[in-house]
Amino acid sequence: MRVVFLDNRDSFVYNLVDLCTSRGAQVDVYRNTTPMSVLTAALEPTEAEKAAGQRPLLITSPGPGHPREAGCLMELTAYALEQRIPTLGICLGYQALVEACGGQVAPVGPTHGRTDRVLVTKAGAEFAPLAPCVIAPRSGEQAPYGWIDVARYHSLGSRELPAQLVSLAHSRDDVVMALRHASAPAVGLQFHPESILTPAGPTLISALFTFLTQEA
């Protein structure tokens, strides 16, 4: 599988690239200053991919600031949704999915380098890629669908989603931590799956690769 990886100038980028390659992906990295014409060409399937019925996967990385200030991130995210390119947005990339669908990203309080136990929603419990990562609640815990331990490094986020996005998990103060698009092959993670503070990260990335390539 080929991944077109948009680097939003974050210190975690190559940890994430290494995680993807460890899952068997060929990863081509582009900075968010790359011209859109180069990126759209990279996202076109090769002849071999066409013959196999495959498309490359777009991953948009974490990064500093607001997604609307991150080079071509917003334009590329909107293009990927329109063209139904399988897309995984992580942290800043997740926020770009929210904004591209008409939602708003706003300050939610700094949570840099913190492990958090996030609650899975009913939709998350029904989302196959999350299933192997969910820890079942113990008796008396207020987590009817289970929870996941994740690494959070962000100060912006979203507590409400536009209609076409579905919350899969949220923090205890209702900041959305994972989403999927209702009709396009796109998933967003506000947390960092590549961090050692997200124990199920490698399992989740493998499951998302399978899901997104099948949905394309």
Q: How would you name each of these model-derived features?
A:
Residues 13:
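Active-site-adjacent helical/loop segments in soluble small-molecule enzymes
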Residues 19-25:
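A short, Lys/Arg-enriched amphipathic alpha-helix followed by its capping loop at the start of a domain
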Residues 26-34:
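A short beta-strand-loop structural module common to alpha/beta enzyme folds
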Residues 129-183:
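Catalytic beta-strand/loop cores that center a nucleophilic Ser/Cys/Thr
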Residues 196-216:
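Acyltransferase
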